[in-house]
């Protein structure tokens, strides 16, 4: 066997394994050292990939989960290797405008497909709490901010007051990726087809619109490593505006709009 480590996906170290017949696999494991009990849960990743394999959501074929830490030092799992492309920059400078448009359309469609999965039918009813996701997020991060702040920031106090007062219906529940972004997809060579969505370590039962809002952050927030879409011109770039990207997602799910969209962006 030959082993080489991938760039990226480093929260849980990821390796390519090549056997004597030149067949390639992916090994993903917990990092070494002392860890929080709920952190780096590769068994949860394996469970969600196993549940989704064969559905309308593209994931790599799961092969085996090994919980015996004596084998490689930590729990790990093996899945199929996807020979494809990973794009780091959200503006896709290496592609043409029509290719960019198709990439973003497919990304929106796959997220919509994920949120349409009946998590009970695929055996993930116990994968998280049903309902109350936004309330838990507001409470948790407000507590984190209060515990770690070093100075008073009136704008944060205003935000923490605004969120609970403007919280929408919090009963919506779906299977959420938690880190759905361009970099966490493997695309086919020569086409915009998504071979697999990867890095499921934050997957849980959550709110679909919060998952979508996270995916739309490049339209608002600069990122020194991945770039942004703050000044995106859809006419020349081929990349849809945020409004049209969200509309594509809505169309795929049969929705007319996302109510309280600003709330999810702020959250």
Task: Give a label for each model feature.
Residues 128-129, 256-267:
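All-alpha amphipathic helical-bundle segments outside canonical DNA-binding/catalytic cores
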Residues 210-254:
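Active-site activation/catalytic loop segments of kinase-like enzymes and analogous catalytic loops
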Residues 2-175, 188-193:
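ATP-binding pocket architecture of kinase catalytic cores
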Residues 175-177, 182:
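Catalytic-loop of the protein kinase fold
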Residues 98-100, 200-207, 235-236:
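Glycine-rich "substrate-gating" loop/helix at the edge of Rossmann-like oxidoreductase active sites
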Residues 83, 92, 146, 202, ...:
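A generic structural signal for secondary-structure junctions
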Residues 186-226:
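Catalytic activation segment of kinase domains across protein kinase-like and atypical kinase folds
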Residues 48, 182-184, 214, 244:
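Hydrophobic side chains within alpha-helical segments
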């Amino acid at each position: 066997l030959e082993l080489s480590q991938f760039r990226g996906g480093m929260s849980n170290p990821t390796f390519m394994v090549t056997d004597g017949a030149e067949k390639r696999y992916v090994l993903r494991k917990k990092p070494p050292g002392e860890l929080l009990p709920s952190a780096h849960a590769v068994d949860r990743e394996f469970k969600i990939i196993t549940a989704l394999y064969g559905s309308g959501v593209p994931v790599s074929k799961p092969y085996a989960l090994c919980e015996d830490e004596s084998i490689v030092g930590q729990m790990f799992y093996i899945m199929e290797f996807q020979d494809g492309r990973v794009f780091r920059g959200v503006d896709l400078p290496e592609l043409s405008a029509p290719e960019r448009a198709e990439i973003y359309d497919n990304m929106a469609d796959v997220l919509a497909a994920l949120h349409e999965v009946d998590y009970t039918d695929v055996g993930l009813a116990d994968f998280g709490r049903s309902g109350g996701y936004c309330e838990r997020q507001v409470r948790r991060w407000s507590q984190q901010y209060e515990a770690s702040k070093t100075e008073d920031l009136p704008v944060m106090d205003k935000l923490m007051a605004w969120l609970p007062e403007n919280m929408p219906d919090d009963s919506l529940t779906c299977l959420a990726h938690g880190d759905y972004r361009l970099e966490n997809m493997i695309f086919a060579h020569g086409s915009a087809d998504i071979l697999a969505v990867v890095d499921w370590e934050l997957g849980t039962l959550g709110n679909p619109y919060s998952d979508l809002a996270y995916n739309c952050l490049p339209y608002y927030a600069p990122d020194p490593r991945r770039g942004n879409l703050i000044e995106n011109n859809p006419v020349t770039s081929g990349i849809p505006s945020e409004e049209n990207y969200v509309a594509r997602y809505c169309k795929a799910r049969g929705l007319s709009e996302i109510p309280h969209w600003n709330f999810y962006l702020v959250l």
